[in-house]
Amino acid sequence: MQISVESLSSVKKKINFEIPAARVASEVEKVYDEIRKHAAIKGFRKGKVPKDIIKKHYHEKMADDVLKNIVNDTYFKALTDEKIYPVSYPVIDSDELKVGENFKYSATVEVFPDVEVKDYDGLEVKKEKFVLNDEVVTGRLREMQENMAHLEPAEAGVAAKSGDYVTFDFKGSIDGVPFDGGAADDFQLELGSGRFIPGFEDQLVGMKSGDESEIKVTFPENYGQKDLAGKDASFTVKIKEIKVKELPELNDDFAKDFGEFETLEDLKKKIAEVHNLQENERIEADLRDRLIKALIEKNSFEVPETLVDKQLNLMLENSKRRLAMQRLTIEMMGLNDEGYKAQFRSAAETQVKGSILLDALARKESIEVTAAEVDEKLEQIAQQNNQDLEQVNKFYQQNAQAKENLSAQLKEDKAIELLLSKATVTEVERKELDK
C-alpha cells in the first residue's frame, strides 16, 4: 500500500492511498464468502450460490462492502502512522473499484492547528470601572413587583394601554391569502412586550373589549420565515378580554414575602449586594473576553470550519434554551437557524481561537490542574447550586466527559490568570471601553 499526504492548508490534509490489486482481490473474496453465507436466491441452497450469481444479484452491495472494508482498514492505520489527528469526518473520493487493478482513493480531513503562542507578555487591555448605581435597586424592586403582580379584568369600556394583557383572536393574510402561523384564538399578549411583528402591538393600544379591527403591518426584511420577509400583511383582530396588572405595595410586608427579610430596607441591601456581585462578575468576564481578543490579534492562524460549526451549534442550542424559558423563539427575534449562524459566526470563531490559544499557552507554560483544584471547584459547584457535595462528586465520577470539560475550564482559567499577571490593564468608564 502506498500513502502520501498533502497539506491543503494549515488545517486541512488530503491523504492519498493506492491499494495493490492483490489486496483488492483478497477483499472481494472475503466479501463474497460473507454474502454467500446469508444470500437467499431462489433455486439455490443457502451457502451454495455460485460466485457469478452472487455478483449478478449483489454487485452494488459487494462493491460498497469492499470499499468500506478497505477504507476502514487503511484510513485509521494511516492516521496513526502519519500522526494525523482529525477534527472532522473524512471526505472520501475514490476511483471505480476494479478487480485486477490497483485501487486509489483519498481522504480529506480537517486537523487541529499547530499553534505556537507568542507575544503574550504585556497585552494592553481596558477594564470597565465598577460604579455603584442606586437606580438598579429601584429597577429590581419594580421587576419583583411585576413578578408578584396579579391580573384583574379591566372595567367595561376601558381602552387597552401598554402593560395591559390582551386576549384576542386574529387571522392574518397576505394579498387576501391566509398563511401558516397567521391565525390563533384566545391569544394573550402583554402590550409593549415586543413579542409581535413591529407595529402590531401599537395598533392594539386604545382598543376595548369586544372591539374588532383590521391591523396592517409589514414583516421585517430579516424575518425568520423567508417567504414572509418584507411582505405587507393584514390581520383581522377581535379583542375578547383586557386585564390590567395590579402591583403590590412596596413596604415591609412586601419584603417579608421573600422569606429572609424583615424590612424593605433589608431587601434593598440584599438587592444591592447581589447586583454588585453580578456586576463584578460581568466586568471580569468582559475583561477576559478583551484579553483573549488581544491575544488573538497577536497570533494569526486558521481554524477548522468543523470546530467553528460545532461551537455555532452549541451557541444556537443555548440561545434557544434561554429563549424557551421566556416562552420565546429565535423566529420571534426575526431570525432562523441559518440567520443566527450567519450573525454569530464571527463570535464562534473568536471563541474557538481563544480556546486553542489558551490551550497552547497552558502547554507552553506547563500549566496543570491538580486533583485538589478540581475538588475545590466541585465544592464551589455544590455550594452555588445548593447541592450535596457527595451527589456532585458522584455525577462527575460517572460522567468522564463532564469532568474532562471541568478540568479544561480550570486550565483555561489559570492561563487567563497568567495573561492578566503579565498584562497592562487600564480601568475606564463604560463609555470609554471601545474608544
From Swiss-Prot:
Give the comment on domains.
Answer: Consists of 3 domains; the N-terminus binds the ribosome, the middle domain has PPIase activity, while the C-terminus has intrinsic chaperone activity on its own.
Which biological process terms from the Gene Ontology are attached to this UniProt entry? 'de novo' cotranslational protein folding; cell division; chaperone-mediated protein folding; protein transport; protein unfolding
> What job does this protein perform?
Involved in protein export. Acts as a chaperone by maintaining the newly synthesized protein in an open conformation. Functions as a peptidyl-prolyl cis-trans isomerase.
Q: HAMAP family attached here? A: Trigger_factor_Tig
Q: Which residues form the PPIase FKBP-type domain?
A: 163-248
Q: Which GO terms describe its cellular component?
A: cytoplasm
What is the species of this protein? Geotalea daltonii (strain DSM 22248 / JCM 15807 / FRC-32) (Geobacter daltonii)
Isomerase listed as a keyword: yes
Major location (coarse): cytoplasm
- What's this protein's name? Trigger factor
